[in-house]
Amino acid sequence: MSQEFNVVVLGASGAVGQTIIEILQERNFPIAKLFPLASSRSAGGTVSFNGKQVEILDVDDFDWSQAQIGFFSAGGDVSEKWAPIAAESGCVVIDNTSHFRYDNDVPLVIPEVNPEAIADFRNRNIIANPNCSTIQMLVALKPIYDAFGISRINVATYQSVSGSGKEAIAELAGQCSKLLQGLPIEPKVYSKQIAFNVLPQIDTFMENGYTKEEMKMVWETQKIFGDDNIVVNPTAVRVPVFFGHSEAIHLETIQPAEAEDVKAVLRDAPGIELFESNEEYPTAVTESAGTDPVYVGRVRKDISHSHGINLWVVSDNIRKGAALNSVQIAEVLIRDYY
């Protein structure tokens, strides 16, 4: 990996963009020049990279032929406009929005699960990063899928407000402060109060009664595993936590498996930190926030189903759920395919 690359981070002023830049630095990604980009509203500010302040440039004025790799995290509309332009200019786009995820000719990649899919990046010079809730679930389920097969996934998510952006973080903090002082609140980011509450809606409702967030987990699981026979039944819930998503997962395996069998395949799996004791378990706040692993605990046999396994999975949605996964894709790209 002696070659260095000119790298774009589009959405550099946002939470995911800033974290991508931090992770690029932490992991010593071989960068010749970093181009932080944003809309004209955010251009002119700076980001810190390798001990220097780097100016955020206006995407409208950028010459894409200067870049070899681009990380996009500025929203689907921005990716729709700029990703094809960047890709046609020779920049490989790693897109963190949902815009390209369901296109058949765009690989949807979790490096611990299906790194071989990156080989298809030249179809359009675009690689899609999956949804945060899908990433942590499939990192945890891949070893189980390989060892025993999976026929059905029931999952309930408990997703932090950072998944909705900086405004949602501020809204939760502000509501908590006001309510503790006995002051009224006015929800803006969410349709209902989020402080001291849980909301069984993430994204818009679809005709089948599921939300778009829930259906993302269905579509993405089948595409990433390359298995349309897996049945996925999700309920996605927003909870008053700042960072880190949690998931209660109830599996039905094709081959029967005991809890100890499942722990054995999870123990040394890449990207996973396993909590084996019943008395110890990971949480979003105490383990996942600000860290990279996918944490798995409460692995147990389902007492209601002979092929059932239950587990609890938590991960930082901004890091592994978005920024880290994007950088890991780029690492595999330059190591094996560039």
Curated annotation (Swiss-Prot):
The protein's annotated pathway: Amino-acid biosynthesis; L-lysine biosynthesis via DAP pathway; (S)-tetrahydrodipicolinate from L-aspartate: step 2/4; Amino-acid biosynthesis; L-methionine biosynthesis via de novo pathway; L-homoserine from L-aspartate: step 2/3; Amino-acid biosynthesis; L-threonine biosynthesis; L-threonine from L-aspartate: step 2/5
InterPro entries reported in the protein's UniProt record: Asp_semialdehyde_DH (IPR012080), Asp_semialdehyde_DH_beta (IPR005986), NAD(P)-bd_dom_sf (IPR036291), Semialdehyde_DH_NAD-bd (IPR000534), Semialdhyde_DH_dimer_dom (IPR012280)
Keyword NADP (UniProt): yes
Source organism, top-level taxon: Bacteria
One Pfam family this sequence matches: Semialdhyde_dh
Positions with a binding annotation for substrate: 159, 238
Chain positions recorded as NADP(+) binding sites: 13-16, 41-42, 162-163, 187, 317
Annotated SMART domains: Semialdhyde_dh (SM00859)
EC number: 1.2.1.11
GO molecular function per UniProt: aspartate-semialdehyde dehydrogenase activity; NAD binding; NADP binding; protein dimerization activity
Record protein name field: Aspartate-semialdehyde dehydrogenase
Biological source species: Shewanella sp. (strain DB6705)
Native organism taxonomy: Bacteria, Pseudomonadati, Pseudomonadota, Gammaproteobacteria, Alteromonadales
